[in-house]
Amino acid sequence: MATIYATGKRKAAIAKVWLTPGNGEMLINGKTLDQWLGGHETLKMKVRLPLEATKQLESMNVKATTLGGGYSAQADALKHGITKALVEFEPSFRAILKPMGLLTRDSRVVERKKPGKKKARRSPQFSKR
């Protein structure tokens, strides 16, 4: 079977994912998942979720490059990319992944700062007298 390519996005992070049938090897930016995320167990679980849900954790190799954003956003982008690649690999996985909300792109991004405000919505302190 050929290599499947997909992209995932979250906030400012973009993940390019290549999925191939194999032995469950994961390389992100040239590092293994444990080297890349260190002690962030929740983020590792988040990345593995689509593969575990479809029982493909031991039978798919994942090669990915991530850029932009922080570790959490990159992990979410990677999860989104893996999910899209799995659905392209086997369309029947859509029925498993769609109800879990993994195919939906999380469109929440940082709200811009407005003039006259301290942050996006925080106003300067108001004094009546």
Swiss-Prot record:
Keywords in alphabetical order: Ribonucleoprotein, Ribosomal protein
GO biological process: translation
Domain of life: Bacteria
UniProt keyword rRNA-binding present: no
Keyword presence, Nuclease: no
Disulfide pairings: none
A Gene Ontology cellular-component term: cytosolic small ribosomal subunit
Positions with biased composition (Basic residues): 114-129
Disordered: annotated span: 107-129
UniProt GO molecular function: RNA binding; structural constituent of ribosome
Family named by the database record: Belongs to the universal ribosomal protein uS9 family.
Protein's name according to its UniProt entry: Small ribosomal subunit protein uS9
Protein species of origin: Sulfurovum sp. (strain NBC37-1)
Lineage: Bacteria, Pseudomonadati, Campylobacterota, Epsilonproteobacteria, Campylobacterales
Gene that specifies this protein: rpsI
